Amino acid sequence: IFLRHPSGILKGLEQMMDTRELVHEVSLGGKTIDGNVQFFYALIAMACFYGCFIGFGSAIPLQANLSSLAARRTVTPTHKLKIVLSEQISAFFLGYLDVIILILYLRYILRLDFQGNMTPMLLITFLGCLIGVSLGFFVGSLGKMREGVKIGILLAVSMTCCFLSGLMNNTMKDIVEKNIPVLNRLNPAALISDAFYCINVYDDPARYYRNLIILAVMSVLLTGASFFMIRRERYDSL
């Protein structure tokens, strides 16, 4: 070969030295995997979860032992469920607007690799904000504890859930899944993060809807519990 086609030796060496990457790592759904995207999914989950402070702020005006406004509202004939829902809905839309702005910023300004359709992403954040506000309203309705104690509870719960969802360590959610999988089914932040994975990486609609259903059920339970706690509150004097 060297005697008959000496030019072929040079071409062969050039091909051997060509180090172009011919294999690309993709998910089963055919979408490129970025290991850092887990942090941003967990960040969105934290933004949804922090709606708990908006919900908490809406529950405080219904605690007659904490404010004079709440004392006046407590004695009105308005049905307690109507009061709870009106406060919670207004708090929810405020938190939801904040998260929508965050998603638009991450996707169109920072141009992060969110390959899924926007509609499923907005549905995730809808239920994510709902669970956040519901949690805050629930904690705000707990007994006659001081406001500072309730804020401490919200901080502890929200930061623990966000940590376990992978906000500080992108392998944490997988560690929990291997050792205590039920915890990932009960952690709202992990459910939100996993739902984003389902539409952007895994392409797993069944798992996506399972996460949404769990979030919806938890929101309903927390709202119902808040209503019953506010309804049964009694005061010796206002």
What are these regions (language model features)?
Residues A91-G95, V99-L127, S141:
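Secretory targeting signals
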Residues H5, V75, L81, E233-S237:
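Hydrophobic transmembrane alpha-helices and immediately adjacent juxtamembrane helices
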Residues T74, I101, Y105-I109, S193-V201:
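Regular secondary-structure segments
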Residues T32, T76, R111-F114:
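Helix-boundary and loop/linker segments of multi-pass membrane transporters
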Residues G116-L238:
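Membrane-spanning alpha-helical segments of multipass transporters and channels
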Residues I1-G55, N200, M229:
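Transport-system extracytoplasmic interface segments
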Residues R4, D18, F39-F56, Y96-V99, ...:
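Hydrophobic alpha-helical transmembrane segments of multi-pass membrane transport/permease proteins
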Residues N36-L106:
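Hydrophobic alpha-helical transmembrane segments of multi-pass membrane transport proteins
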